[in-house]
A protein has these predicted regions:
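Solvent-exposed, charged helical/coil patches
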Residues: 1-34, 112-120
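Basic, amphipathic alpha-helical patches used to engage nucleic acids or provide basic targeting signals
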Residues: 11-15, 43-109
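A generic structural motif
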Residues: 34-35, 84
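Short acidic-hydrophobic surface loop/beta-edge motif
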Residues: 38-40
Length: 120
């Protein structure tokens, strides 16, 4: 587990420009007061972004080949079995329609972790 944590720490220092942008939008409870972590280890995996309270994993994907997609499916299955909900976005989705990405994250958070206080 220490190897995974060490690798996660390294990844936090080497974010892609897409990860940097999404982290800017999610960090420090800027996003609807939900707390997110970046490059968060869960088991033998490292999640791009995680809201632990809602058990939501947000993944950003670049160009992929078949082996990577198969790995991602297996990883998502394992995370689902552990109670995590995973949503994925392509890197270009963030640049092309940032608002839609944030809206989808918020809708998912509200579904998984509804606010204890109803909005007026």
């Amino acid at each position: 587990m220490e190897i995974i944590r060490s690798y996660a720490k390294q990844l936090r220092r080497e974010l892609t420009k897409e990860e940097r942008r999404l982290w800017y939008l999610l960090r420090s409870r800027r996003f609807e007061n939900y707390k997110f972590r970046r490059q968060h280890p869960v088991g033998n995996y490292i999640l791009d972004f995680a809201c632990c309270a809602a058990r939501l994993a947000v993944e950003l994907d670049g160009g992929q080949h078949d082996e990577k997609q198969k790995y991602d499916r297996q990883r998502t299955c394992w995370l689902n079995e552990k109670g995590w909900y995973v949503i994925r976005f392509w890197n270009n989705e963030l640049w092309d329609n940032e608002e839609a990405v944030l809206e989808k994250i918020l809708e998912t958070l509200q579904m998984l972790h509804p606010s204890p206080r109803p909005t007026p």
